[in-house]
Amino acid sequence: MKRILFTAGGCLFYLLLAVKAYAYDCSATPAYQDGVNYQSGDLVSNTGAAYRCNVAGWCSTGGAYAPGTGWAWTEAWDELGSCDGGAGSSGSSSSSSSSSSSSSGSSSSSSGSGSSSGGTSCDGIEAWQVASIYTEGNVVQQNGERYIANWWNQGQSPEDNSGAYEVWSAAGSCSGAGSSSSSSGGTSSSGSSSSGVSSSGGSSGGDSPIARHGKLHVCGNGLCNADNVPVQLRGMSTHGLQWYGWGNCITGNSLDTLAEDWNADILRVSLYVQEGGYETDPAGYTAQVSHIIDEVTARGMYVLVDWHQLDPGDPNANLDNARQFFTDIAQAHGDKTNIIYDVANEPNNVSWDAIQRYAMEVIPVIRQYAPDAVVLVGTHGWASLGISDGGSAQDIFNNPVTIDNIMYTFHFYAASHGQVYRDELRSALERGMPVFVTEWGSQTYTGDDGNDFVSTQAYLDLLDQYQISWTNWNYSDDFRTGAVWNTGTCSADSWGVGNLKEAGAWVRDKIRNR
């Protein structure tokens, strides 16, 4: 069955969370209704519990923020306790659970301590084990308390890692000691779980990309690790989150596959601004990006947050939205060492000087909360260093972004972009430009048609020569040849190599074999 956090996976999560911290008189508390314009301080009842609105805009959004059921509800509401009967309008507020209200919206973790007055039996719930692997929804007990895993983890004690933005959620006290066998438990290091995770895989413990390289910084043409050794990251890009995001092609199982089987270093998270993307639901899409960041981080990979502006091509048209989005994401995740930010996907039909002005406006927003983060700037001509718009890399050399620790992006589709584009890229690299290839394909610029692996290999050889990091487009089952998975793979949540398209098998090999 496909794992969707806010449906199948969410049911388990919130059902088990139904053991509330304290009783609350809901007789005068109105029932929650989707679509109502709730204000901060408003009280509602839902799923047998009382809640108080904490962030007005998100309380009114519904869906992911519906109290007690949405996967990001803890970002909008404080839980006041279990209803001891009834539902109606204005009950008094007792102490709230400590759910975080960061403006970014993020993970599904609950922050309350969840200890009930009498407790619930923990018979059949296994004790947490340091060597076991746990995935979303797994339930354990530790020192008389129950906990639910929010995402993949190993060796992270529930007692020390539960709460908002943590890998575990507290789910109440145990009334009994409990036994050590349960179908909801994790996987021992010698076995395999239902999601196919094994502790011997590349992303666990000290063998993950983050563990190997630590915090990255720009050096020369590319990236260096914490020891100042050049690093080339190889990985994948999502398709648009509005079509193929969390719960569709991006699931716990698909990320396990990317980390454990493909041995990828990085996932680019592509948030479209238009085309049904961010501007239609800023809070919802911010929460989705934030949750994916947590999921990818838990698997030991780097995350490239991609502000996927495309049409209009001038990034300044989305300047206010960009400021808000990057404020929210950087504020929530600025303390992480594995986040790279791309402030403009493919600027087009706009001068480099206009892009440079935009970058000088947006990068300080990120640096306010993530002062050492690597930031990428999209180049003109659909990230072609200007070639596709009649410009060149010289435009960038004439007016560079005068902020440290930044890189410029280059995109190619090998069946469309031949030697002229490679020559311009090589020239820019020879002159010392720091470059990250955040999107490429072996097809035409439409992401479709036949694969030109000869031209593609010529590009990859050049990137290897200069240790240039890259992410391939795209990790979905879209019908086009550039999507790595066959149509239907995502709905089946089955990620074996037999489901790969020709280009998918090819790029998997390039990621695995260095």
Curated annotation (Swiss-Prot):
Description of how activity is regulated: Exhibits strong halostability and halotolerance. The activity increases about tenfold in the presence of 0.5 M NaCl, and about fivefold in the presence of 4.0 M NaCl. Tolerates detergents, but activity is decreased in the presence of EDTA. Activity is enhanced in the presence of Mn(2+), Ca(2+), Ba(2+) or Mg(2+), and decreased in the presence of Zn(2+), Cu(2+), Al(3+) or Fe(3+).
UniProt entry keywords in alphabetical sequence: Carbohydrate metabolism, Glycosidase, Hydrolase, Signal
Similarity section: Belongs to the glycosyl hydrolase 5 (cellulase A) family.
GO cellular component: extracellular region
Temperature dependence: Optimum temperature is 50 degrees Celsius with CMC-Na as substrate. Thermostable: retains 59% of its residual activity after exposure to 70 degrees Celsius for 30 minutes and 49% of its activity after exposure to 80 degrees Celsius for 30 minutes.
UniProt-listed SMART domains: ChtBD3
Enzyme Commission number: 3.2.1.4
InterPro entries cross-referenced by the UniProt entry: CBM5/12, CBM_sf_5/12, Glyco_hydro_5, Glyco_hydro_5_CS, Glycoside_hydrolase_SF
Industrial or biotech use: The halophilic feature and the tolerance to a broad range of pH and surfactants would favor the industrial application of MaCel5A in diverse environments.
Underlying gene: MaCel5A
Signal peptide residues on this chain, from the entry's feature table: 1-23
One GO BP annotation of this record: polysaccharide catabolic process
Protein name, UniProt field: Endoglucanase MaCel5A
General function of this protein: Endoglucanase that exhibits highest activity toward barley beta-glucan, lower activity toward carboxymethyl cellulose (CMC-Na), and marginal activity toward laminarin and xylan.
Record-level Gene Ontology MF annotations: carbohydrate binding; hydrolase activity, hydrolyzing O-glycosyl compounds
Pfam short name (any one): Cellulase
Catalytic residues of the enzyme: 346 (proton donor), 439 (nucleophile)
Region of interest: Disordered: 91-118, 179-208
Catalytic activity as recorded in UniProt: Endohydrolysis of (1->4)-beta-D-glucosidic linkages in cellulose, lichenin and cereal beta-D-glucans
Cystines in this chain: none
PANTHER family linked to this entry: ENDO-BETA-1,4-GLUCANASE A (PTHR34142), GLYCOSIDE HYDROLASE FAMILY 5 DOMAIN-CONTAINING PROTEIN (PTHR34142:SF1)
Positions with biased composition (Low complexity): 91-114, 179-201
Protein species of origin: Microbulbifer sp. (strain ALW1)
pH dependence: Optimum pH is 6.0. Is relatively stable between pH 5.0 and 11.0.
